Amino acid sequence: MTSGPSQPFPSASGPDDGPSWPRILGRLTTGQNLPNGHAAWAMDQIMTGAATPAQISGFAVSMKMKRPTASEVRELADIMLTHARRVPTDEIGTDTVDIVGTGGDGANTVNLSTMASIVVAACGVPVVKHGNRAASSLSGGADTLEALGVRIDLGPDDVARSVREVGIGFAFAPQFHPSYKHASIVRREIGVPTVFNLLGPLTNPAGPRAGLIGCAWADLAEVMAGVFAARGSSVLVVHGDDGLDELTTTTTSTIWRVQGGTMERLTFDPAAFGFKRAEISELVGGDASENAAEARAVLGGAKGPVRDAVVLNAAGAMVAHAGLASDAQWLPAWEAGLARAVEAIDSGAAEQLLARWVRFGQQL
């Protein structure tokens, strides 16, 4: 297949070495990394509608099986962002935080990152949550927020205004990545995790510089951390050692701490902070209305394993946000984050913030 006239990635090495689908898929299916620029070329073909569904699915699956490099994934994410609608940051800035995971862990837990986002915002840390409807679980973050009464369909200006006025905004992926529709159809049809699972957390249209980013695959968590390190972000990329794309309370988690362009791998045990071990069954959710009811209960002060996991993940996001300052210290940041998260729930601040967020959407 020839590249279209809009193709902005010509090869400097002549036509024989330039990117093409047979060349790219040939390399990926034999386990070879792509030359610089080839992943970007492929993603541009996908985003402009020039790639066929067969080419998209072949690329998505073979790239995941080959195990993408950080530079390949960064090319994919950067091209996706060039095609995106962006949230204006002239007033809200980029010292914001996102709490989001790749999905694909198969555990169907309650929406921990969604609840944690509300708690973090109630602590005064500005949040821009990037999310979507469920792909493999019963209820994604967008589904649960909608069931809570939050408007999920806001455009760029209103998301920025939501962050400014409420302290949190939700960027619904289909609103901001319309060109991604070609890939999302294929992704739904093939129904297995692909390299595209990594891109959601890497393509927040508000460009937050901090994040608690969950990855369901331990080997790919390190790849994601490499992309964030290249961007100079302050991020904790986390993988529950039980397979969750969250900081888990059932066992330890592996954390890739990204700060100042460097990456450090750590084993994190919540028991060190006094958390009881949970069973995975205690964190399992249901449909959107059931998960919304659970969120209301937790934000209303209900104790138990779900609250523990929400507090832990909210604290992790605040640790990442604290890392934007070069003098941030690991243990004091955790202690402060955990105390702030508990206070935000127990004082009623988190519940009140959700009510303000719902009201904001109703008044638009």
Curated annotation (Swiss-Prot):
Q: Where does 5-phospho-alpha-D-ribose 1-diphosphate bind?
A: 101, 104-105, 109, 111-114, 129-137, 141
Residues the entry annotates as binding Mg(2+) 2: 245-246
Reported cofactor(s): Mg(2+)
For bias kind Polar residues, which ranges apply?
Answer: 1-10
Which Pfam families does the UniProt record give?
Answer: Glycos_trans_3N, Glycos_transf_3
Task: List, alphabetically, the GO terms of the cellular component aspect.
Answer: cytosol
**Disordered: annotated span:** 1-22
HAMAP family from the entry?
A: TrpD
Give the family from UniProt.
Belongs to the anthranilate phosphoribosyltransferase family.
Protein name (database record): Anthranilate phosphoribosyltransferase
| Organism this protein belongs to | Mycolicibacterium smegmatis (strain ATCC 700084 / mc(2)155)
